[in-house]
Regions:
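Short beta-strand edge/turn micro-motifs at domain boundaries
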Residues: 93, 97-116
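Short, well-ordered alpha-helical segments enriched in acidic and aromatic residues
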Residues: 16-29, 33
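A short hydrophobic beta-strand element
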Residues: 72-80
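Short, cysteine-centered beta-strand-loop-beta hairpins and adjacent loop/turn segments enriched
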Residues: 82-91
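A solvent-exposed, acidic/Ser-Thr-rich amphipathic alpha-helical stretch
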Residues: 28-70
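Short, surface-exposed coil-to-beta transition loops
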Residues: 61-62, 77, 90-96
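Hydrophobic beta-strand positions in extracellular immunoglobulin-like domains
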Residues: 80-82, 100
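Amphipathic alpha-helical repeat scaffolds
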Residues: 8-12
């Protein structure tokens, strides 16, 4: 899959809450850097974190606003909205830096405006 497609597919899969398909997109040694958490290394650790995040936000949907790509790296500007498990509305805006290696996502780093919810 070309890098441009995998960057979009990552968010499509997240919106569908398809953990199995997300695992197919990740390199076995994928790294995730997320505000207020320690770095996570390895596909299993990343997927475990995503599962926890999805439980905290039973409704959460991302909309890609723009993608700035340079080779196997991209900065994806997004907005999101949803509801947390206490049924409180949630919305945010941010950028996710993604990098691929051998056709799989190997690096994810999130930056967003509102970190108070975490």
């Amino acid at each position: 899959m070309p890098d441009e497609l995998i960057f979009h597919k990552f968010f499509e899969v997240f919106n569908r809450r398809d953990i199995e398909e997300m695992g197919n997109l990740l390199n076995p040694t994928a790294e995730l850097f997320f505000p207020k958490t320690r770095p996570l290394v390895g596909k299993e650790h990343v997927l475990k974190f995503v599962n926890i995040l999805l439980r905290q936000y039973p409704k959460l949907s991302f909309k890609i606003e723009r993608v700035i790509q340079q080779g196997d790296r991209a900065a994806v500007h997004w907005t999101n909205q949803g509801m947390n498990r206490r049924k409180e509305p949630y919305q945010n805006e941010g950028v996710t830096i993604l990098e691929t290696h051998n056709g799989k996502i190997s690096f994810i780093s999130d930056f967003f405006k509102n970190t108070d919810a975490f």
